């Protein structure tokens, strides 16, 4: 079934094939991808869309000497398969297996580690300048999607690269879809570029490159006038100083190879625009590329998920609350940076389209945009993953907290995220947020508490954040009523002796389980900022050991805040802080990862017993 594919263990093997064999290789590679991801889960649509491009890049360029940087990196499965990792795909994103994103420590062909968007042009430019400075003639290539091109960092890099004489090739993979449909003026510009009339002025270098390449016609059901197209020297990318070439059919291997070979001979900044289709070659993914962007196990014969019925996720709890709250308060507006589905805003967007704002992959803009809304009477709710909030830290401080604006943050994927690994882990938000003045931070221990915290945060007259983990909680009954929680107050959940465990958020359940063995007192702290100082001081004064447990980096996290609180009160009871260690934690199964970090009941018991025996 995969006879030709199984003969490819490196790009050197690939380069020995003739053009006819490359077409068969693409067919086998696509079939292998579908069947492999069906068994492991992972990203599918984006990978099916770059099969031909990946083959062409490794066929034309001398990788790994020539550097290829993949933006975001979720579309690198074909790249991994063709660079000696085909046999490892069965353990994709599993403990001890290969990562779902490029890793420099995994392969010499992974030239730059990615996971977040819009970094590829900057990295490839740095590599191009390094080649220039060391006298190397190697090529540097950045592959970036149209969704990632909406981020400001991509344009900062284009602006810098166009002014240099470095040999960099930027390939815009235009599939008209990131995770959520792309938005804004740039996307409209690209759409017009693809569907506009034939221009009569053609740049000589573009003519040289395209040469005998046939025009793109009716590709991916685009408009009839879709591109016979070259572009004038006045286009956006040429204004940045690039030689623009395209758009060309990104699923035509022959066109890709001819074009890339010609570009390889050119000097200076080059920009190749290719048109592709997410999910190409697999009908279920073509019909619903969003569903197959990140997918669990499924039946490859029909694309149907092999899903187990589970508890309501925290994302769904937020989604339900947002719709309910929006019905009560017409000032509420929802904002997301290109994560409508993942952050649970679909229902809100459908019911309140005029109050929903997907700003694209532009986290910095999202926060300041929300700040402007808050200045003039709206009540913005920013739904964002913990890992992506990191990209807008200055905006959080300067534009929101400094002005004490009532912007609410629903921080999803807080803590470990399982198979997506360290690039997507929400390990640091408590550490980097709690030092900011004016903010309140809450961490729910169950689904119903999450709903009440969202309500409390929304009513707060200042910056607020509710951070919750990926997946489901313990299965608490969710009440329709919304109740205002007292700011900065925790609750005593179990009275014991000697040891008091202060649990934050998702760690309450394992803390209570551990307490049964230890006969420990357990407090559900609820608030990371402001802390319940009275409760902390009371427990510290009546117990011989205080233990803090959190699903956040132990350095600078909630435990550190508790120690600061006790120090301020001149209380010297010993404190044991449990949390995520000072390291990037590899991908795996969430429950197993927590156990390895000592954050399950057994780990908590072991850590406390070890402390008590010293």
Swiss-Prot record:
It comes from the Bacteria. SMART domains: Transket_pyr. The keyword Magnesium applies. Thiamine diphosphate binds at residues 74, 115-117, 147-148, 175, 282, 363. GO terms for cellular component: cytosol. Pathway: Metabolic intermediate biosynthesis; 1-deoxy-D-xylulose 5-phosphate biosynthesis; 1-deoxy-D-xylulose 5-phosphate from D-glyceraldehyde 3-phosphate and pyruvate: step 1/1. It catalyses: D-glyceraldehyde 3-phosphate + pyruvate + H(+) = 1-deoxy-D-xylulose 5-phosphate + CO2. Binds 1 Mg(2+) ion per subunit. One of its GO terms (biological process) is thiamine biosynthetic process. The keyword Transmembrane helix does not apply. Its cofactor is Mg(2+); thiamine diphosphate. GO terms for molecular function: 1-deoxy-D-xylulose-5-phosphate synthase activity; magnesium ion binding; thiamine pyrophosphate binding. SUPFAM superfamilies: Thiamin diphosphate-binding fold (THDP-binding) (SSF52518), TK C-terminal domain-like (SSF52922). Belongs to the transketolase family. DXPS subfamily. Homodimer. NCBIfam families: dxs, PRK05444.2-2. This is 1-deoxy-D-xylulose-5-phosphate synthase. The lineage of its organism: Bacteria, Pseudomonadati, Pseudomonadota, Betaproteobacteria, Nitrosomonadales. The gene is dxs.
């Amino acid at each position: 079934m995969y006879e030709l594919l199984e003969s490819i263990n490196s790009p050197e093997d690939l380069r020995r094939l003739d053009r006819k064999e490359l077409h068969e290789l693409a067919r086998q590679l696509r079939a292998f991808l579908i069947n492999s991801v069906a068994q492991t889960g992972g990203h599918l649509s984006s990978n099916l869309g770059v099969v031909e491009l990946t083959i062409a890049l490794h066929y034309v360029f001398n990788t790994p000497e020539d550097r290829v940087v993949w933006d975001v990196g979720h579309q690198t499965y074909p790249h991994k398969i063709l660079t000696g990792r085909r046999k490892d795909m069965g353990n994709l994103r599993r403990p001890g297996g290969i990562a779902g994103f490029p890793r420099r420590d995994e392969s010499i062909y992974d030239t730059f580690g990615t996971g977040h968007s819009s970094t590829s042009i900057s990295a490839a430019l740095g590599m191009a300048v390094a080649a220039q400075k060391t006298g190397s003639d190697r090529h540097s290539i950045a592959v970036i999607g149209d969704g990632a091109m909406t981020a400001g960092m991509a344009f900062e890099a284009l602006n810098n690269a166009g002014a240099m004489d470095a040999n960099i090739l930027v390939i815009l993979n235009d599939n008209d879809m990131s995770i959520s449909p792309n938005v804004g003026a740039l996307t409209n510009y690209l759409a017009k570029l693809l569907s506009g009339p034939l221009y009569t002025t053609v740049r000589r270098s573009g003519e040289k490159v395209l040469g005998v390449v046939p025009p793109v016609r009716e590709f991916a059901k685009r408009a009839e006038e879709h591109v016979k197209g070259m572009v004038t020297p006045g286009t956006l990318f040429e204004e940045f100083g690039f030689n623009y070439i395209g758009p060309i059919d990104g699923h035509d291997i022959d066109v890709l190879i001819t074009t890339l070979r010609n570009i390889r001979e050119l000097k200076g900044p080059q920009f190749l625009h290719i048109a592709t289709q997410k999910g190409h070659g697999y009908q279920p993914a073509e019909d619903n590329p969003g569903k197959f962007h990140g997918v669990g196990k499924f039946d490859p014969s029909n694309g149907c998920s092999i899903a187990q019925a589970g508890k309501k996720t925290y994302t769904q709890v937020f989604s339900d609350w947002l719709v309910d709250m929006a019905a009560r308060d017409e000032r509420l507006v929802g904002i997301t940076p290109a994560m409508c589905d993942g952050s649970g805003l679909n229902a809100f967007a459908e019911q309140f389209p005029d109050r929903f704002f997907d700003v694209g992959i532009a986290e910095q803009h999202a926060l300041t945009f929300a700040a402007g809304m808050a200045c003039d009477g709206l009540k913005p709710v920013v739904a964002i993953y913990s890992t992506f909030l990191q990209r807008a830290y200055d905006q959080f401080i300067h534009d929101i907290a400094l002005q004490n604006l009532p912007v609410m943050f629903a921080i999803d994927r807080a803590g470990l995220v399982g198979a997506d690994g360290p690039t997507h882990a929400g390990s640091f938000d408590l550490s980097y947020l709690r030092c900011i003045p004016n903010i309140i931070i809450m961490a729910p221990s169950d689904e119903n508490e999450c709903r009440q915290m969202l309500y409390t945060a929304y009513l707060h007259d200042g910056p607020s954040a509710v951070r919750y983990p990926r997946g489901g909680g313990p299965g608490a009954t969710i009440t329709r009523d919304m109740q205002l929680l007292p700011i900065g107050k925790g609750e005593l959940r179990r009275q014991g002796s000697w040891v008091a465990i202060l649990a934050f958020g998702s760690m309450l359940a394992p803390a209570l389980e551990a307490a049964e063995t230890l006969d420990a007192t357990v407090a559900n702290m609820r608030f990371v900022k402001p802390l319940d100082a009275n409760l902390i001081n009371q427990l510290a004064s009546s117990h011989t050991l205080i233990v803090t447990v959190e699903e956040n980096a132990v350095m600078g996290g909630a435990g550190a805040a508790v120690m600061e609180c006790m120090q301020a009160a001149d209380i010297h009871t010993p404190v044991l802080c449990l949390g995520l260690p000072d390291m990037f934690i590899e991908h795996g199964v969430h429950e197993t990862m927590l156990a390895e970090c000592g954050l399950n009941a057994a780990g908590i018991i072991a850590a406390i017993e070890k402390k008590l025996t010293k």
